[in-house]
């Protein structure tokens, strides 16, 4: 299967051009989002596709994944529920065709499925911190060697010296004046900020393995922290296209780890 998935990935990337029905970028599926038939999450050469035959398939260079639901429904869609599970729904049934398993006790909340630089899909959540929603009518110091993603920061990664997350016209910037600022459009249009301008030199922001965001100066003094701490694990900070920066975690499921919750339940 892995060989066929790799050989087909480039062809699918060209054929499946329909946009994701989501308020997130094309590498992220949030709770409440819907991935319609023949739509996909994509990152670089990897694609996570809700196929027309009702099979959910991850095409990558790392072994791939599939839900094994070929022919089990019509007009199938993929959703991320508020317990951190992926659900495949058929247009002709009210019962899910397939639901992913998950680690730990299910907790209701907002989750995020991210197709990351490891070419696997991992679900993080629930959300434990966020900047304020800019529009309520819109929906809702070790440097890691994880490759950088434009709109996502992973646990142990660091931002400094005007590094930023970006999506559409929003940017979350760790400014060289020690202020963490969320801007829309121009650099001067600040939507949210940590309010730490001038409080340190050579400051950096780090996302820890408990979901804590911390700004420190070059002497490792804490300048600001989000004060939201979850259980130990892997977290992500996602800059969403509705202008919110949200921390999700810990990881509860991954296509990379079937023995630890990555297996799936076909109903």
Curated annotation (Swiss-Prot):
GO biological process: response to other organism
Cysteine disulfide links: 54-76, 178-203
Signal peptide: 1-24
UniProt key word Signal: yes
Keyword S-adenosyl-L-methionine among record annotations: no
Molecular function terms from GO: D-mannose binding
Entry keyword set: Disulfide bond, Hemagglutinin, Lectin, Mannose-binding, Repeat, Signal
Residues covered by the Bulb-type lectin domain: 26-136, 150-260
SMART domains the record matches: B_lectin
Domain of life: Eukaryota
The protein's assembly and partners: Heterotetramer of 2 domain 1 and 2 domain 2 chains arranged as a dimer of domain 1/domain 2 heterodimers.
Role, per record: Mannose-specific lectin. Has weak agglutinating activity towards trypsin-treated erythrocytes from rabbit but not from human.
Protein name: Mannose-specific lectin 1
């Amino acid at each position: 299967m892995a060989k066929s998935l790799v050989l087909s990935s480039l062809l699918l990337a060209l054929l499946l051009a329909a946009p994701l029905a989501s308020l997130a970028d094309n590498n992220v599926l949030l709770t409440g989002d819907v991935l319609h038939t023949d739509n996909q999450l994509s990152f670089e050469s990897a694609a996570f596709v809700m196929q027309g035959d009702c099979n959910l398939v991850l095409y990558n260079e790392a072994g791939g994944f599939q839900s094994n639901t070929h022919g089990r429904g019509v007009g199938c869609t993929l959703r991320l529920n508020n317990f951190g599970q992926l659900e495949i729904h058929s247009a002709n049934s009210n019962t899910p065709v397939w639901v992913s398993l998950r680690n730990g006790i299910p907790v209701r909340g907002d989750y995020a499925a991210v197709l990351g630089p490891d070419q696997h899909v991992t679900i993080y959540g629930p959300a434990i911190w966020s900047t304020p929603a800019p529009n309520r009518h819109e929906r809702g110091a070790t440097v890691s060697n994880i490759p950088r993603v434009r709109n996502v920061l992973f646990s142990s990664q660091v931002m400094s010296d005007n590094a930023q997350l970006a999506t559409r016209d929003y940017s979350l910037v760790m400014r060289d004046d020690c202020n963490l600022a969320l801007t829309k459009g121009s650099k001067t249009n600040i939507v949210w900020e940590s309010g730490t301008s001038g409080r340190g030199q050579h400051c950096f922001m780090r996302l820890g393995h408990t979901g804590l965001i911390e700004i420190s100066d070059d002497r490792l003094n804490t300048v600001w922290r989000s004060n939201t701490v979850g259980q130990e694990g892997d977290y992500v900070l996602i800059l969403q296209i509705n202008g919110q920066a949200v921390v999700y975690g810990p990881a509860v499921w991954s296509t990379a780890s079937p023995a630890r919750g990555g297996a799936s339940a076909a109903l």
